[in-house]
A protein has these predicted regions:
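Binuclear metal-ion centers of metallo-dependent hydrolases, dominated by the metallo-beta-lactamase
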Residues: 68, 80-93, 174, 178-225
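Pre-active-site segment of Zn-dependent metallo-hydrolases
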Residues: 13-51, 56-60, 110-115, 140-152
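Active-site environment of divalent metal-dependent phosphoester hydrolases
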Residues: 29-30, 51-56, 76-79, 93-96, ...
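Zn-dependent metallo-beta-lactamase
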Residues: 1-20, 27-30, 96, 101-103, ...
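Short active-site oxyanion
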Residues: 3, 63-68, 132-134
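Active-site HxH/HxHxD metal-binding segment of metal-dependent hydrolases
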Residues: 34-113
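Active-site-proximal loop/helix segments of hydrolase catalytic cores
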Residues: 112-179
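Active-site neighborhood of phospho(di)ester-bond hydrolases with catalytic His/Asp-centered motifs
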Residues: 22-24, 42-50, 70-73, 135-140, ...
């Protein structure tokens, strides 16, 4: 049995087949994060893009744990230059890892590293493990190809940004949930800062009105999958 743990903003931890995977590990500077760098351990890190609130503490965590980072080619090459083990991928590609299969999808956003380095295209990520499929959308606008993602993949859990301003807001995220046809929706990327404040109860009501389940996890909370 696997687990999804939410650590605030878009930072998500997965336990799959004995591996710990961190997605977008934003700890330092994240007022919602429930853990510190000192008690962070993992086997893999998945990055959706290079912005500081997603790239976060990747370098320190990867070095401390000798973890492999899974990312788009430009991000992976940048990390290679920092002495980090990284597996480079690109949009539409998939690859098998000990914990399951990872596929990168489109995301409509932008991507650069905190030092201004171009970081390639932003991505969403599909992770299949033990018959369960998780979709972490990263930072993205609503786009019609989400419907295609939903048609091609039976998604059990979709983690969708709802904070508006930089990403989808509530209404667009509800439409994304319709397109994806996921069983359970988990909101991310909201209430970290004032500019992305969102009413998660409103989001829950609107998701339930389209016949989907919504689980809004507080930082540190988890669900078994």
């Amino acid at each position: 049995m696997g687990k999804i743990i939410f650590h605030g903003h878009s930072f998500t931890e997965l336990h799959l087949k004995g591996s710990k995977i961190l997605i977008d590990p934003f700890i330092s500077g994240n007022p919602l994060c429930d853990i510190s760098l000192d008690n962070t351990n993992c086997d893999y890190i998945i990055l959706t893009h290079g912005h500081g609130d997603h790239f976060g503490d990747t370098i320190d965590i990867a070095k401390k744990n000798d973890a492999t980072v899974i990312a788009t080619a430009e991000l992976a090459y940048y990390l290679h230059g920092k002495g980090i083990t990284a597996h480079d991928m690109n949009l539409g590609g998939s690859h098998g890892f000990p914990f399951g299969r990872v596929k990168l999808t489109l995301a409509h956003h932008s991507s650069s590293l905190p030092d201004g380095t171009y970081a390639g295209e932003p991505a969403g990520v599909l992770i299949e493990s033990d018959g369960k499929l998780i979709y972490h959308a990263g930072d993205t606008a609503l786009f019609y190809d989400m419907k295609l993602i939903g048609e091609m993949h039976r998604i059990n859990y979709a983690l969708l940004p709802i904070g508006d301003n930089y990403t989808m807001g509530i209404d667009d995220a509800v439409k994304a949930a319709e397109f994806l046809n996921a069983e359970t929706i988990i909101p991310i990327h909201y209430n970290t800062f004032e500019v992305i404040r969102a009413d998660v109860d409103e989001f829950r009501r609107k998701i339930e009105s389209i016949g989907k389940k919504c689980i809004a996890l507080l930082p540190g909370n988890s669900i078994e999958i």
